[in-house]
Amino acid sequence: GGHCVARLDDDPAGRVVFVRHALPGEVVRAVLTEKSAKIWRADAVEVLSASPDRVRSVWREAGPGGVGGGELGHVALSAQRTWKRWVLADCLRRIGGEEVAAAVAALPEAAGTGAVPVEAMPSEAAAEAGDDPRARRLAGTGTRTRIALTITDDGLAGMHGFRSGTVLPVTSLPLAVST
């Protein structure tokens, strides 16, 4: 999740590249992070034409070249829900077939749209309504109950880089539940 599909402008083969930290419709400058015979991956490092759904990432350490786990941190909450709804519906259709997709579309919550219902968490709803200043700051964060930390060579708390065995130090984890 959290990748956009791009095509290289100057590639006669029309090669497909999966780009993290981009949004549908954006034009970005990206750095290739992985090349194989079947798939290329990249990180968007500069946004040349931004989506209206782009926001400042809630977790800079999960940005380009950083740790994994924050691939939608730069996406507005309402757009995250739309994205997740589409991914879930697509998976149900591909794996479960059209019969499952039709059953989901018939759910009262889908309201005839065929979309899978994805609702805001209470903190998100309060933030969107402007009811709670703290929730506004924390909306979309503080929900992850499990994290996998490791130790860097310097003895600092860290996490693995995206698709990497390299341990990167982390000083914040805004997605984690605070106690």
Residue ranges and their predicted role:
Residues 1-179:
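Accessory RNA-recognition modules of RNA-modification enzymes
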